[in-house]
């Protein structure tokens, strides 16, 4: 394929007549070898792994002529864009190439080597040898939606919330108490999901105006109790004291792993929470510092060190009276799984500089009551964090860098429930003195200086 001569259309490896006859594999190899696209390079001498620039169109330094050139070339090659006739649409060009890569059995993304949260983001792909190919890939739900023209993944539909509960969410923040965020015990038909984000991911969602002038905005949290919940049972003062002591506990038990090998285990003690990071820290706050150690010399050391290099600002975790929160400050992508994860079979990403709730105390206690009184499955209280790689990922269980986090109060109450099955726990409410600023402790971490 000659890419160096002819009109601008042939410059991008395309002609209007032959656009549908080429294959992505050979086309991409030709583009990489041409050297015309900055950042599109081979990663190894064997020319089996390559890096492809992946800058978002919303970046301030985005240059359409340069950053969208490869995506435009693919659209030209496939006949999906006609120079001088069709309106330029870089996001759609990018979507088409991404879907083609995901669908093709010629390519496999090396997620642990891709970097999407740096100033010049890129993805890394491996060209699958002919003898190692599997059947054709199936497009994921996100890919299908993107191909259909949706610029962002769409969440599954949920039934409408009861009017009273919607009213609570529409109240101004300063008029809300913690009860407005607690589970509505009278509507067991509402499944628990946290968070349920309406509209484009990473964008502020704004719903239609209501007749009373209120408008629903933001990210919603809805939860319901188990199908059957035993009424409050009087308990001995000693048990009540044990519960109260546990519920005032802000400690976190944290285990750090490299490739399933435990490299550090500790318990944090600061009421302000902790910061998980790597390398030297210059933090002057009261956060406990949880540092990933330098990896031993093994086959994955370089890959691990590369991921660790993007953890400088780290991840902040803290316990509030109502649950465990996280705020990602580092460049590295962080994915998580836990009792509040929206998806159990595909990645849940912590967005940068946004607070996310990972564990809900009220939900845990409701499930613990049912476990203790009715023998239901034990409630989940462990959160898994995965750094630099998509998680959960059923196809690739072993990850380079992970952390397991448990609120110590949850483990204590779970063990206590095991030992006192049948006469444990009353209906739990957050203390009356918990004010709105206390509830939103995330605000205390929004001004952390790095």
UniProtKB/Swiss-Prot annotation:
Record key words, sorted: Activator, Cytoplasm, DNA-binding, Nucleus, Phosphoprotein, Transcription, Transcription regulation
Single GO molecular function: transcription coactivator activity
Function: Transcriptional activator. Binds to the interferon-stimulated response element (ISRE) of the MHC class I promoter. Binds the immunoglobulin lambda light chain enhancer, together with PU.1. Probably plays a role in ISRE-targeted signal transduction mechanisms specific to lymphoid cells. Involved in CD8(+) dendritic cell differentiation by forming a complex with the BATF-JUNB heterodimer in immune cells, leading to recognition of AICE sequence (5'-TGAnTCA/GAAA-3'), an immune-specific regulatory element, followed by cooperative binding of BATF and IRF4 and activation of genes.
Induction (UniProt): Not induced by interferons.
Family (UniProt): Belongs to the IRF family.
Protein name: Interferon regulatory factor 4
UniProt xrefs under Pfam families: IRF, IRF-3
Tagged with keyword Electron transport: no
Post-translational modification note: Phosphorylation by ROCK2 regulates IL-17 and IL-21 production.
InterPro entries referenced in this protein's UniProt entry, alphabetically: Interferon_reg_fac_CS (IPR019817), Interferon_reg_fact_DNA-bd_dom (IPR001346), Interferon_reg_factor-3 (IPR019471), SMAD-like_dom_sf (IPR017855), SMAD_FHA_dom_sf (IPR008984), WH-like_DNA-bd_sf (IPR036388), WH_DNA-bd_sf (IPR036390)
Organism: Mus musculus (Mouse)
